[in-house]
Amino acid sequence: METEDWFKLKRYPHIGEPLSLKDYKWIKAYVENPVSVKKHSFLPLIHKCIIKRKYRADTVNLVRNKKTGERMRFIDKPKVRHIYYASHLDSIVFSYYNHLISEAYEKLIATKNFNESIVAYRKIPITKGSDKNKCNIDFAKSTFEFIKKNEEKKLTAIVADVTAFFDNLDHKVLKKQWCKVLNLKTLPEDHYNVFKALTKLRYVESDQLFNSYKGSMLVERGVPNSYKEKEIKRIEIESNKYFKEKNAVAYCTKEEFIQNNLNLIISGKNKKGIPQGSPISATLANVYMLSFDQEVYDKVEAIGGYYQRYSDDLIIVCEQKYEDEIIKYIRDKVQNLAKLEIHPSKTTVYRFEEINGIFKGYEIDEKSKERNYNKSLEYLGFIFDGQRVLIKDSGFSKFYRSMKRSFKKSTSLALYSKNPDKRIFKPKLYKRFTHRGAKRKLIYHPSKTDPTIYERTKKYYWGNYLSYIYKANDSMRSLNDGRDIIKRQSRKFWNQFHKLMRFHESRLIKQK
């Protein structure tokens, strides 16, 4: 069945059972009817905290590990992201209105001179008429190319990160810009109901809802002696990390929630901010920054500079003589026009100039102007020092940690499964963590009428992290003097993979 792009089914557990393709017709009629959406009662969001550990190389002391020779790392303050999940029907309502607002935004921004400077959450074709869109690799490359093309000048690159972007969006500014995109003086009643659902935050803590049912969840199970039939039943689950394994589909039904859990609803008295994680949040972030983007672009263009914004990360490249003026200007516009804030520690200043005949980039202290030649421009996951482009080490570290976790999990499954061989399932690991799974392929499924025939789908197997590395290498090769510098960064993964394989296979042998 052909469906609209905005019809996106989710499988995460929420209040009420997930929707299915069978629901498409009535959902389409419902969300496309402004009267229905105007009266729609949104369920509370479910709130979770995602905590990510952050490791940083010590660029001050430059102490190296005696065994490996690598720079020592320290654990930085963990990054906490507050994610809010909408119920399944609410999510599709948000998705549909995201579609409407996104279309209106794209139509408006196409008439603006800063159209190509706003790059996050948008489908920007690689070339005009192409069905392939740009990604962060292309956006970073265009920034580095601008610097490289102007290497006869003394340049400054200012990278700023807006503090707690989604949490601090001013509701009055958002509403004003929303109206601007729709070319209306006030929001229609259906749009206003969606606006209220996002700004008058009501949510439930996931752990509290889980515990209120004594650690049990509604799960989907197959019916005995039936190939197709499914049933929903409540079972006890030890913790939320087993939700996917047990095929948990809901914390409770809508009726159970109304009867038992209304006391768990937290009404956030938030005068600013929208929930991060809803299908509409990303588009609204771009809508919110419309006036800011216009004024900053005009200012930077007037001095022959370069401006690009990727969500809450923005970069400006200008001549060094405008450095202090632009830093002050950006802070003023973020605070007074966008009603947001840039934390001083989140603003990094780099300079590019010729040193001893070599065009070189380095970091400077904003106040003291002290130079740090050990730090180069970091933007969108890449490092650029004026001569070459590399992928940041943090990306490789994340991939390696993921590899280690997968080996541990595979070993545990081999040890405690009913499989008498007690062997690691190698094909899956090779596909996920080596070049063998790096090729991107179109997915084919067996035909429903004839299982011996495979039919082409619209889905792709997008490869693994090495696919991204190879793509980045090909794209950045022109900036790396035709060399495969980025590809060389990944050479150690093959040895690391087999080192882990030998270690975990020896563990299994000892356990037999």
In which residue ranges do the predicted regions lie?
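Non-catalytic, polymerase-adjacent accessory regions of viral genome-replication enzymes
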Residues: M1-K79, S490-K512
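Conserved pre-motif C helix in the palm subdomain of viral-like polymerases
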Residues: P78-E116, T163-F166, K269-D298
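Active-site-proximal segment of RNA-dependent polymerases
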Residues: N98-H171, Y192-G215
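Beta-rich nucleic-acid/ligand-interaction surfaces
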Residues: I118-K123, I315-C318, T348-I358
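Conserved polymerase palm-domain catalytic core
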Residues: E152-Y310, I315-Y329, N374
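Helical (often loop-to-helix) elements that flank the catalytic cores of nucleotide-handling enzymes
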Residues: Q320-P344
